[in-house]
Amino acid sequence: MIMSSYLMDSNYIDPKFPPCEEYSQNSYIPEHSPEYYGRTRESGFQHHHQELYPPPPPRPSYPERQYSCTSLQGPGNSRGHGPAQAGHHHPEKSQSLCEPAPLSGASASPSPAPPACSQPAPDHPSSAASKQPIVYPWMKKIHVSTVNPNYNGGEPKRSRTAYTRQQVLELEKEFHYNRYLTRRRRIEIAHSLCLSERQIKIWFQNRRMKWKKDHRLPNTKVRSAPPAGAAPSTLSAATPGTSEDHSQSATPPEQQRAEDITRL
């Protein structure tokens, strides 16, 4: 049996094809971008699952945000903290991350420089002052003065002292026994009641004036009657005009008649 084939035939010439590099250099094989393969995969995926799931809604186009160095967080920061807190807690790390980004060679036009590292702004004094309540000078004035060892007796402005019930009670007790105080007793009362000597002195002056006003009688100017044990000689010496009348009344009527006869 005779075998006839192309391999056995000696007249057969082996075809020679150029390598693939020559095809790519001569643009015989078109080069596709990566987007082309992505489109084919997406189209095939949608083709297989188009019946099961509806097409997703179109995504809105958001403007690209330019991130600065403040948005970078250090390795020690916990998740969820904002850029202000990261810069506040780790200022050294944030400063080390603030470096100019290298320019890419693909961009022909120079890209705008990133904004400078924003440091945490200090709190405004007006906001801190608005939170604190306003205290006026008249609110700082304490009406009940305390004991001052260096008190020299002079005050810039006199103010009405508001005495407490305990202070008034102790002063009334002292006034009941002593209407006039000595210097030593005044100092003791001032220290015990947390008052100054001047305040004790003024209170006793006012209390004495009130006592005199309350005990003043309407007939104080009328001469009072003499006591029962007084001698009549003192009264006669005090009033010479009335002594003659008393002597005449003391003589018996017979002597008066004798004197009248002698006068005739």
Curated annotation (Swiss-Prot):
Keywords: Developmental protein, DNA-binding, Homeobox, Nucleus, Transcription, Transcription regulation. GO terms for biological process: anterior/posterior pattern specification; cartilage development; embryonic skeletal system morphogenesis; positive regulation of transcription by RNA polymerase II. A motif (Antp-type hexapeptide) lies at residues 135-140. Residues 100-110 have a biased composition (Low complexity). Belongs to the Antp homeobox family. Deformed subfamily. The keyword DNA-binding applies. Residues 156-215 bind DNA. It comes from the Eukaryota. The keyword Transcription applies. Pfam families: Homeodomain. Its main location: nucleus. Residues 19-130, 214-264 are annotated as: Disordered. This is Homeobox protein Hox-C4. GO terms for molecular function: DNA-binding transcription activator activity, RNA polymerase II-specific; DNA-binding transcription factor activity, RNA polymerase II-specific; HMG box domain binding; RNA polymerase II cis-regulatory region sequence-specific DNA binding; sequence-specific double-stranded DNA binding. CDD domains: homeodomain. Residues 32-51 have a biased composition (Basic and acidic residues). PROSITE patterns: ANTENNAPEDIA, HOMEOBOX_1, HOMEOBOX_2.
